[in-house]
Regions:
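N-terminal targeting signals for export/organelle localization
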Residues: 1-47, 179
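Hydrophobic alpha-helical transmembrane segments of integral membrane proteins
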Residues: 3-7, 13-14, 79-80, 136, ...
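Short gly/ser/thr-rich secondary-structure transition/capping motifs
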Residues: 25-27, 47-53, 122-125
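A short beta-strand-turn-helix
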Residues: 44-67
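Short pre-active-site segment immediately N-terminal to redox-active cysteine/selenocysteine motifs
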Residues: 64-66, 70-74, 138
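Hydrophobic beta-strand core positions in alpha/beta domains
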Residues: 67-69, 98, 144
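Structural microenvironment flanking redox-active thiols in thiol-disulfide oxidoreductases
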Residues: 79-116, 126-132
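Thiol/disulfide oxidoreductase modules built on the thioredoxin-like
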Residues: 113-118, 125-176
Length: 179
């Protein structure tokens, strides 16, 4: 009996590890649970990217369905996502606000002048503290809020046309239909 256990124990351990590996490989890396889903957006007041003497706050994003896109000029994926954000903004189906994250103001302003500006307004989060309040892991990330300012969706990584068509636009339409 002890002889069989000596061979059975490594087999059981191997099967357990193989099962854990299979489970880990089947997870979608874009799906990271956020404790903020279903909760009010964090309270914030930040200077505008375009004017350091003016501010934008969480109250500016309430009363309508909005998207908040966290981006930076140092973020390679943000550049790939930018064209898709411009297309989404042109549809007029959602107001997109930006949060420029841990960046240099002049670099970010130049970026928007050269590539186009899909945002209604841009908050400037130079030190990243507001991004931390939002649970940001890195850029880009996009949040969708309902009319009451409740976070309903978080997308990690660059948005694609497929993401917008299959995830965001149906969600936005559903949120717009709510009272």
């Amino acid at each position: 009996m002890a002889r069989y256990l000596r061979y059975l124990a490594p087999l059981i351990l191997f099967l357990l590890l193989a099962g854990l590996l299979y489970r880990g490989l089947s997870l979608d890396p874009k799906v990271v649970p956020s404790p903020l889903i279903g909760k009010p957006m964090p309270v914030f007041t930040l200077p505008l990217l375009s004017d350091p003497n003016a501010t934008i706050s969480d109250t500016d994003l309430r009363g309508k369905v909005t998207a908040l896109n966290i981006w930076a000029t140092w973020c390679v994926s943000c550049r790939a996502e930018h064209e898709v954000l411009l297309e989404l903004a042109q549809t007029g189906k959602v107001d997109i606000y930006g949060l420029n994250y841990k960046d240099k103001r002049a670099d970010a302003q130049r970026w928007l002048r050269q590539l186009g500006d899909p945002y209604i307004a841009n908050a400037f989060d130079a030190d990243g503290r507001t991004g931390i309040d939002w649970g940001v892991y890195g850029a880009p990330e996009t949040f969708i809020m309902d009319k009451q300012g409740i976070i309903r969706h978080k997308h990690i990584g660059p948005l694609t046309r497929t993401d917008i068509l299959n995830e965001l636009l149906p969600l936005i339409a559903r949120l717009e239909a709510e009272d």
